[in-house]
Amino acid sequence: MTSIKRFVLMALAFALAGLNTGHAYAQCPTLSESSMDQALIWSGQPVVGKTYKVQSWLVQDGDSLGLPAGHRLRLGQINTTEMASKGRPAEAFAQQGKDQLTQQLRQQDVIFLQLLPAIKDHYGRWLVKLYDGNGLNVEASLVTQGLAYVISMDSQGAAQCLWQQEKVARSQGLGLWQASISQVRKASILTAKQGGFMRLKGAVTDISQSQHYWYIGLEGHVAIKIAKLRLAWAPLRITSQTQLEQWIGQTITTRGWLAWRKLNKKQRKKVLSRV
């Protein structure tokens, strides 16, 4: 069977051009004193809905930390740029993101975290909301300075306060939102050399689905893969293919990780690829 290639983007956030999902600006809430007082000691077997405290950690980059016994944390509502690795240079503002996280957690006796419902990412890292020793939202600190993109690794989506703080940072051209860095790429002109985390836009051409995912085809050779549960939540509340097919011909702006996948014709028709 003849095989072809297609870009597949694991979408973590997207919007229709002109779709208004705005909310009034709000500061992200701090962790309450009662939550900090009642926080459980991290044991490596966390439960969703509980608050945990950690007394020893190592900042690995702007959105991840290492804990004793090999446990790893990933901030589940943001993404910072990549540090230098395996001969590849650091991306813009990667070091600043790591430095900001390090500075905020420095001289803290304890930090607090809450597990996201998704629990872990595909690298085995615990997905968490992170607070410093004073109960301040660590992700918000990075977003407000333009050092992180808001994403959603959970079907319930990232906190609205983070989206609003990102909007302000973007309007002020802070950090990653400088024009030369934050350009949205066009799906129609992607090449096989491009990949990784990016912001992308393109006109919708087709819709397909699997048991748990929607696949939104864009002009060129791009398919957006997004969990059905994520679209079922507010503000979109999309639960049927008929609803999504109304988007055909409209332009979508999205962000996520892009991979170049080799698919056979049957797979391409259904766009059932794994990222």
Per-region residue spans from a language model:
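Bacterial N-terminal signal peptides that target proteins for export
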Residues: M1-A11
